């Protein structure tokens, strides 16, 4: 009888582990603010979704005001869209692999930026990043290299 109860207990634990495991391992949702008329912004959103992220995209008339509300005041960091994930700000065409690395390492940063609109970046003219840098920035908006492609 006790052996039978142990077996049922093990089975129940396994079932619940498989059922709720993905909920705990899922990546946080990325919230994106972008212009409705910007095709590369939508392609970056699509790229992130294809890479497994859940993305909530907001079309806004003034993306710069969103950047400022989030605390990005240095125009040198700006790109065409702004995102927030896991407490970090993502500015521009940052590759999904860099976002995952940021979320896994949890550095004391404000976020990542791919300033401007790098031509060979996800959402622009390439899925594989080439020929540009992704910078990390702190609350003082001082930058240093995060990744180079």
Question: What do these predicted regions represent?
Answer:
Residues 1-10:
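Bacterial N-terminal signal peptides that target proteins for export
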Residues 9-19:
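Bacterial N-terminal signal peptides
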Residues 24-25, 84:
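Short glycine-enriched loop/turn motifs at secondary-structure junctions
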Residues 25-51:
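Local sequence-structure signature of Cys/Sec-based thiol-disulfide redox active-site neighborhoods
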Residues 27-29, 53-54, 78, 108-110:
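Loop/turn elements at helix/coil->beta-strand transitions in domains of secreted/extracellular proteins
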Residues 35, 61-66, 117-118, 124-126:
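Mature soluble domains of exported/periplasmic/lumenal proteins and thiol-rich metal-chelating peptides
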Residues 45-92:
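N-terminal, post-signal-peptide region of Sec/Tat-exported proteins
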Residues 76-149:
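Thiol/selenol-based redox catalytic cores and closely related redox-interacting motifs
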């Amino acid at each position: 009888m006790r052996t039978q109860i142990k077996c049922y207990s093990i089975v129940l634990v396994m079932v619940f582990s498989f059922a709720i495991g993905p909920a705990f391992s899922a990546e946080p949702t990325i919230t994106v603010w972008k212009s409705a008329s910007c095709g590369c912004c939508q392609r970056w959103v699509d790229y992130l979704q294809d890479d497994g992220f859940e993305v909530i995209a907001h079309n806004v008339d003034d993306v710069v005001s969103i950047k400022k509300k989030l605390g990005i005041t240095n125009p040198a960091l700006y790109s065409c869209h702004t995102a927030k994930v896991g407490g970090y700000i993502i500015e521009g065409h940052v590759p999904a692999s860099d976002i995952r690395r940021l979320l896994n390492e949890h550095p004391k940063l404000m976020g990542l930026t791919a300033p401007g609109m790098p031509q060979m970046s996800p959402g622009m003219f390439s899925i594989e990043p080439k020929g540009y840098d992704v910078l990390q920035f702190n609350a003082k908006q001082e930058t240093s290299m995060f990744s180079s492609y």
